């Protein structure tokens, strides 16, 4: 319990296969901004209590109950991404003292079930997820499967090959990206609407991009390979 209480963590990348985050683990981590909880991971009571800078959190589909005070006093919370088709129960005070403007994002097929079950926040439950391009090309990744099918003017691409000289890339367009896939988005600057996938996303087995939520250590496996760091679409 209280493993990282009041620490100065600004980001955390939780490993796939993590079984549980214990009670009050990140209590009072006031610089933590975004969290994506891996599939099949359970969370304990008060796990992100008083993380006052936390803006976005992605909850996996196996979460059947959002525990007591899990996100209480997360006063900067803007978006909760609920990836499950089954509506989870809410224990007491799980979203107590959060912003009245927080949005709850769900799959299109689950929209009406969430609105009916969570009727006290029904006006803030939506399946329309805004994505803002601040330049005509930028990097992108999310902790849930993303459907770009109806985002007119916005293209999502994986990188399938590259030429060493000048880091020239070969792209492949996809419409449905798996969670945590590194992507390049292209389009005019502005805000587009994407959705969570209701069915299986495209395969990205050939994608060379690796997503990172924060700092990352990159190490060559051989002396003949150059690694490139891509930030906002540029190397």
Label each residue range with its predicted role.
Residues 6-20, 29-42, 52-65, 75-89, ...:
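Structural signature of tandem-repeat unit edges
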Residues 68-73, 182-186:
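Extracellular/lumenal glycan-associated surfaces
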Residues 78-93, 165-172, 220:
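Extracellular/surface-exposed low-complexity repeats and stalk/linker segments enriched in Gly/Pro
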């Amino acid at each position: 319990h209280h493993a990282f209480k009041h620490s100065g963590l600004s980001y955390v990348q939780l490993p796939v296969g993590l079984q549980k985050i214990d009670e009050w683990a990140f209590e009072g981590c006031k610089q933590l901004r975004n969290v994506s909880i891996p599939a099949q991971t359970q969370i304990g009571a008060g796990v992100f209590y008083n993380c006052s800078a936390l803006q976005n959190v992605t909850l996996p589909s196996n979460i059947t109950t959002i525990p007591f005070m899990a996100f209480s006093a997360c006063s900067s919370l803007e978006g909760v991404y609920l990836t499950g088709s089954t509506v989870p129960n809410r224990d007491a005070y799980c979203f107590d003292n959060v912003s009245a403007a927080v949005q709850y994002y769900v799959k299109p097929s689950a929209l009406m079930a969430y609105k009916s079950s969570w009727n006290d926040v029904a006006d803030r439950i939506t399946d329309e997820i805004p994505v803002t391009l601040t330049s005509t090309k930028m990097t992108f990744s999310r902790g849930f499967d993303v459907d770009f099918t109806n985002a007119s003017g916005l293209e999502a691409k994986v990188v399938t090959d590259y030429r060493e000289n000048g880091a020239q890339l070969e792209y492949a367009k996809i419409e449905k990206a798996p969670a945590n896939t590194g992507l390049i988005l292209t389009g005019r600057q502005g805000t587009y609407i994407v959705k969570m996938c209701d069915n299986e996303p495209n395969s990205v087995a050939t994608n060379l991009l690796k997503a990172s939520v924060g700092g990352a250590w990159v190490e060559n496996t051989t002396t003949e390979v150059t690694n490139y760091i891509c930030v906002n679409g540029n190397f």
